[in-house]
């Protein structure tokens, strides 16, 4: 049954206007980053992959850190893996610029966190508390150089990720465009992160 005074063409017009209004209103409240489509990159370089618990992902990561010449940038949700922490500390001691952005809540609530130990050994540590979880697991080694390396995957830098969980880690070399995208994201988080203690 039609409402009095509204013809079908008026109803269609009003429905169309409402649809346009709702669509443009939603776009107005959408963060600008959502409007930018994710980039598509050409595959290049090499990729090493490790799966846990069957493979030594911690060694793969530590070996990559051992090869760092100038810089290691890290984003970590949780950090309890001693071998990886030791590799970062050793890199710092040999003059490599090492910066870690960690999730504040995880750092404060996990008694076995190695963040304080790394900070006490000269690693520059920053806390990211701008998100429900700072859940990135990323390392950028020598970004901007020919040997730039990106490490990422589900693998938290933890003992549990190595010995208890089913995880994966990718070590990618020779894809500067991909490293640059991750570096841009790392810098976005670094801008709002706060120094540890």
Model-derived regions: residue spans:
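N-terminal signal peptide c-region/cleavage motif recognized by signal peptidases
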Residues: 23-25
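Primarily the HKD phosphodiesterase
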Residues: 63, 67-124
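Solvent-exposed loop/turn segments at secondary-structure junctions
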Residues: 78-82, 104-108, 130-133, 145, ...
């Amino acid at each position: 049954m039609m409402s009095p005074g509204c013809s079908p063409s008026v109803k269609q017009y009003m429905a169309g206007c409402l649809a346009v209004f709702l669509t443009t209103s939603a776009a107005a409240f959408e963060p600008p980053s959502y409007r930018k489509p994710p980039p598509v990159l050409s595959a290049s370089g090499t990729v090493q992959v490790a799966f846990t618990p069957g493979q030594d992902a911690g060694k793969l990561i530590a070996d990559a850190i051992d090869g760092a010449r100038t810089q290691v940038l890290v984003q970590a949700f949780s950090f309890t893996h001693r071998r990886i922490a030791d590799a970062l500390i050793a890199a710092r001691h040999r003059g490599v610029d090492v910066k870690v952005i960690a999730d504040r809540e995880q750092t404060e609530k996990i008694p076995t966190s190695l963040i304080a130990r790394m900070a006490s050994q000269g690693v520059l540590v920053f806390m990211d508390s701008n998100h429900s979880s700072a859940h990135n697991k990323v390392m950028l080694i020598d970004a901007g150089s020919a040997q730039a390396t990106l490490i990422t995957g589900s693998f938290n830098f933890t003992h549990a990720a190595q010995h208890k969980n089913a995880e994966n880690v990718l070590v990618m070399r020779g894809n500067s465009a991909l490293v640059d995208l991750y570096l841009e994201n790392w810098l976005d988080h670094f801008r709002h992160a706060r120094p540890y203690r």
